[in-house]
Amino acid sequence: MSDKIGLFTGSFDPMTNGHLDIIERASRLFDKLYVGIFFNPHKQGFLPLENRKRGLEKALGHLENVEVVASHDELVVDVAKRLGATCLVRGLRNASDLQYEASFDYYNHQLSSDIETIYLHSRPEHLYISSSGVRELLKFGRDIACYVPESILEEIRNEKKD
C-alpha cells in the first residue's frame, strides 16, 4: 500500500499559531505532509519568502513527517501531483472561509478528480487569528507573541533590523 501524502498550502505571511495547529493535526493523518508556501498575487508580501520558509521549518522541526516546500506560478493541484499528494488540507475558521475554499475545491476537482480536499476546523482559541490581523497589529507596533510561533517572531525581528 502506498503512503498517504497530503499538501497544506498558504502564503503564511506570517505563519500563525492557527496554521501551526492545523499542520500538527494534519501531520497525524498522513505518512507525509508537505507544507507549501505559495506566492499569492492578491496579497502584498510582508515577509520575504526565504524568511517565511526558514521560520516555518523551525516551527515545524518537531514534526518528522512534515516538509516545507515553496512554489511560484504553479497551481496547487500541479504541485500536489508533482509531490505525489492525493489530498489537499485546508483549515476553516468560519463560513466565509468555507465559501472561499469551496470555489477552489471546485476548480481543483475539475483539474484533477483524483485529488481530494479535507477541511480541518480551527480550534476555538484560533478562530479569530489571521495573518492579516497579525500584520495589522505589527503595523501599529503591538505585541504579536501570543499569535505566532517563536521562530516566526524571530524572523520578523530579524527582518525589521535590516
From Swiss-Prot:
Keywords: ATP-binding, Coenzyme A biosynthesis, Cytoplasm, Magnesium, Nucleotide-binding, Nucleotidyltransferase, Transferase. Substrate binds at residues 11, 43, 76, 90. The keyword Transferase applies. It catalyses: (R)-4'-phosphopantetheine + ATP + H(+) = 3'-dephospho-CoA + diphosphate. GO terms for molecular function: ATP binding; pantetheine-phosphate adenylyltransferase activity. ATP binds at residues 11-12, 19, 91-93, 101, 126-132. One of its GO terms (biological process) is coenzyme A biosynthetic process. It is found in: Cytoplasm. Pfam families: CTP_transf_like. InterPro entries: Cyt_trans-like, PPAT, Rossmann-like_a/b/a_fold. GO terms for cellular component: cytoplasm. Its EC number is 2.7.7.3. The record marks 19 as: Transition state stabilizer. Its cofactor is Mg(2+). Homohexamer. Reversibly transfers an adenylyl group from ATP to 4'-phosphopantetheine, yielding dephospho-CoA (dPCoA) and pyrophosphate. Belongs to the bacterial CoaD family. This is Phosphopantetheine adenylyltransferase.
